[in-house]
């Protein structure tokens, strides 16, 4: 069997001086971080603040909700199924730092419909004493893997709706509330607000068999990069010396790029995933929702923008950073050098594995072929 993408990254044996220098720089940076010389203040304080989490009834979304509740946040979860929401909200309450002081709410909604997202934000604002939520974290969506040609056009559209449009609709609804300008007489100091997308490393490195899913995640990443620039127009309005009409608070965008996550959705995905796809990602060790949530929250607390949850994902990000903002110019530059060297071998190997699979097994006849 040919090596998979992650195994190539893991098993690479750098011998050239340039690669050794990159590893040395990364090792030094890691030591510095471990000993706290570059410690930063928490940029994601959630105690007493209201957080909306879409897809919060299970998987990563539920884990995020539980961990933010542990930190003292008021939690609103959104999903379609009432029973799952009711069960999840009890688990989230059980994780609360102070269940008598914190507040919890759930809303059943179809996020593929923009009017539903508007309804959610209106309902949360009323529930939150007339104030919009402070943080919105988009975790909704599921993956339907398959070969592009073997997948129906309707499924391709459904994946774009479920993955991209649920996030875009949610972002549009909350930003239209957050970014309404107010007069100077009504302006008062407010903590920074946060909009968080949950994407996938497939937005960095597409893999055969994810044709319905990867384009939607790539679109989400493009939206995030665009908003990261556009939001500065509104943040800049608050820096005006005249303090004319401006938005009430600064807003920061973050995007999380997990790999496999052990969840009910992952189990369903595995049942229909092409065998070639499983081979290509065989060394990808899925993480638990709790682990992904913890790593993501810690990264947001450090103020990071594009967030990966394991080393392989970091290397994949390094190969596709392009013009995206860096978390650390030093670390991301070093990772980018390493990634570009590694992917000189990775990309040809992915294509070779696909070719050899076709030579051995012939034309696929179903999404699970």
Curated annotation (Swiss-Prot):
The chain crosses the membrane at residues 195-215. GO terms for molecular function: 3-dehydrosphinganine reductase activity; NADPH binding. One of its GO terms (cellular component) is endoplasmic reticulum membrane. InterPro entries: KDSR-like (IPR045022), NAD(P)-bd_dom_sf (IPR036291), SDR_fam (IPR002347). Gene3D superfamilies: NAD(P)-binding Rossmann-like Domain. It is a single-pass membrane protein. GO terms for biological process: 3-keto-sphinganine metabolic process; sphingolipid biosynthetic process. It holds the Pfam family adh_short. The keyword Oxidoreductase applies. A motif (GXSXG) lies at residues 55-59. It is found in: Endoplasmic reticulum membrane. It is an enzyme of class 1 (oxidoreductase). Its EC number is 1.1.1.102. NADPH binds at residues 55, 57, 59, 80, 84, 110-111. The active site is at 213 (proton acceptor), 217 (lowers pka of active site tyr). Pathway: Lipid metabolism; sphingolipid metabolism. The keyword Nucleotide-binding applies. NADP(+) binds at residues 52, 110, 213, 217, 261, 263, 272. Catalyzes the reduction of 3'-oxosphinganine (3-ketodihydrosphingosine/KDS) to sphinganine (dihydrosphingosine/DHS), the second step of de novo sphingolipid biosynthesis. Belongs to the short-chain dehydrogenases/reductases (SDR) family. This is 3-ketodihydrosphingosine reductase tsc10. It comes from Emericella nidulans (strain FGSC A4 / ATCC 38163 / CBS 112.46 / NRRL 194 / M139) (Aspergillus nidulans). The lineage of its organism: Eukaryota, Fungi, Dikarya, Ascomycota, Pezizomycotina.
């Amino acid at each position: 069997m040919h090596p998979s993408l992650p195994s190539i990254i893991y098993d690479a044996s750098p011998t050239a001086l340039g690669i050794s220098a990159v590893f040395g720089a990364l090792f030094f940076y890691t030591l510095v971080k471990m000993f706290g010389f570059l410690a930063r203040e928490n940029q994601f304080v959630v105690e007493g603040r209201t957080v909306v989490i879409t897809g919060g009834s299970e998987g990563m979304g539920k884990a995020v909700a539980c961990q933010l509740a542990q930190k003292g946040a008021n939690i609103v979860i959104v999903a379609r199924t009432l029973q799952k929401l009711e069960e999840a909200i009890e688990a989230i309450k059980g994780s609360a730092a102070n269940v008598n002081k914190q507040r919890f709410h759930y809303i059943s909604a179809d996020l593929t419909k923009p009017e539903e997202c508007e309804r959610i934000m209106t309902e949360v604002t009323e529930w939150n004493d007339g104030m919009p939520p402070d943080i919105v974290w988009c975790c909704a969506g599921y993956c339907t893997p398959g070969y592009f040609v073997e997948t129906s056009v309707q499924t391709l559209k459904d994946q774009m709706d479920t993955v991209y449009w649920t996030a875009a609709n949610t972002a549009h609804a909350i930003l239209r509330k957050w970014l309404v300008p107010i007069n100077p007489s009504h302006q008062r100091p407010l903590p920074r607000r946060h909009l968080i997308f949950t994407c996938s490393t497939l937005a960095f490195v597409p893999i055969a068999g994810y044709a319905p899913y990867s384009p939607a995640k790539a679109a989400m990443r493009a939206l995030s990069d665009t908003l990261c620039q556009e939001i500065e127009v509104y943040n800049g309005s608050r820096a005006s010396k005249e303090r004319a009409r401006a938005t009430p608070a600064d807003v920061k965008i973050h995007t999380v790029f997990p790999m496999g996550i052990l969840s009910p959705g992952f189990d369903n995905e595995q049942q229909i995933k092409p065998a070639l796809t499983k081979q290509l990602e065989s060394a990808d060790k899925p993480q638990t929702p709790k682990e992904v949530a913890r790593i993501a929250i810690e990264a947001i607390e450090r103020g990071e923008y594009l967030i990966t949850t394991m080393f392989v994902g970091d290397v994949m990000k390094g190969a596709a950073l392009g013009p995206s903002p860096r978390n650390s110019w030093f670390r991301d530059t070093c990772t980018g050098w390493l990634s570009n060297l590694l992917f000189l071998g990775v990309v040809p190997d992915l294509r070779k594995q696909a070719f050899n699979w076709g030579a051995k097994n012939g034309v696929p006849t179903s999404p699970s072929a």
